[in-house]
């Protein structure tokens, strides 16, 4: 997009409303997108909170004797196969997140010689899965990739945040 066009668009945005409350960014095709600054900050805080809770869940699983690793694959429901997860990135600066697979973690625990429990763990602060996430969980369980899938949910006890694990089979596959 030409510099004159960007200036003209920015001028029109300023004329239309309060430009101090909005931030305009440009996508790959040069199309402007305006966002409220308050919502940008709220998204940043939510991502940071989610990342902190993810670390807490990982530490908790490791304390319970499981070997935990970030799951870097996803399910393509149309093809019915596992595919590498796509990276999320900001085209103007850097890679934002690398591990965007579903579920978040794979946790392995040795039961006895030659037998292991392999579970998938999806971390959600509110414990709610979308319809697509539920379909992916069902697919993983039907194909026998994971023996169980747990949903790690944040539970408040006063100021302290605890972790509650919900078994996907028990809650959704009755």
Per-range role (PLM):
Residues 75, 127, 156-158:
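Residue-level detector of flexible, active-site-proximal loop/helix-junction positions
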Residues 72, 124, 153-155:
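Residues at the C-termini of beta-strands that transition into short coil/loop
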């Amino acid at each position: 997009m030409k510099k004159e066009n960007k200036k003209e668009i920015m001028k029109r945005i300023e004329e239309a409303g309060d430009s101090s409350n909005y931030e305009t960014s440009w996508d790959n095709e040069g199309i402007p997108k305006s966002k409220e600054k308050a919502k940008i900050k709220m998204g940043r805080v939510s991502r940071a909170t989610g990342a902190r809770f993810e670390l807490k869940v990982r530490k908790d699983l490791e304390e319970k004797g499981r070997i935990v690793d970030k799951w870097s694959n996803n399910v393509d429901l149309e093809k019915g196969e596992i595919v590498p997860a796509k990276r999320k990135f900001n085209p103007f600066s850097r890679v934002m997140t690398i591990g965007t697979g579903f579920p978040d973690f794979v946790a392995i625990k040795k039961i006895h010689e030659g037998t292991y429990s392999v579970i998938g763990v999806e971390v959600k602060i509110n414990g709610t899965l979308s319809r697509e996430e539920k379909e992916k969980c069902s697919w993983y369980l039907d194909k026998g990739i994971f023996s169980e899938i747990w949903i790690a949910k944040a539970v408040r006890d006063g100021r302290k945040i605890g972790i509650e694990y919900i078994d996907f089979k028990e809650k959704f596959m009755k």
